[in-house]
Amino acid sequence: MNERQYAAAGVDLVSADQAKARIAVLVAGTRTDLSVGQVGAFGGMVRVPPGLRRPVLVLSTDGVGTKVLVALEAGRFDTVGEDLVNHSVNDILVHGATPVAFMDYVAGAGLTVQQIAGIVEGVARGCRQHEMALAGGETAQMPGLYQPGNFDLAGTIIGVVEEDQALHGDGIRPGDVLLGYQSTGLHTNGYTLARRIIFQQQQLQVGDRLGD
């Protein structure tokens, strides 16, 4: 099939190539001393950090849920990418793991090059903050499955921890001290309910201020 046939089916190969070129630059900017191989390969490769006696890999896959609808409403796409990374880091941190690499997945229809690049820019920024490589990912155009302009975002994180230092929760006992930290916000959870309260019940819009 040629570009014209793909375009008629709703897949823009020209824009896809432009997005890939911009993504490659962003990915290259996250490479660490553990990175192996070339940017754009079918599989992302990273070394296991040196000095570990019995390293255990800790993996987690997650998405940002309906927060993508807030991103679409606000017209800002980099923050959901960064949120995805931070959420994933938290998921493996509870097991005592240090993040090593990340893989992202963007699926949608009718997204512009700027929108796709914005999403991955946020992912790359989050990876740099945590000193881990964005080892690869996938950007899929799926007209017919997604409405034009809509998308979903997910990612997989890989971390590492010494086997005898991994946290499983099975050592928790009555009398242990529980430390709680104040959240900086909703992060990526609860947005279906939050959107209902804020946008439907309260009739607020993006840009409205709450309180003084």
Residue ranges and their predicted role:
Residues 1-212:
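Helix-biased detector of long, well-ordered alpha-helical tracts
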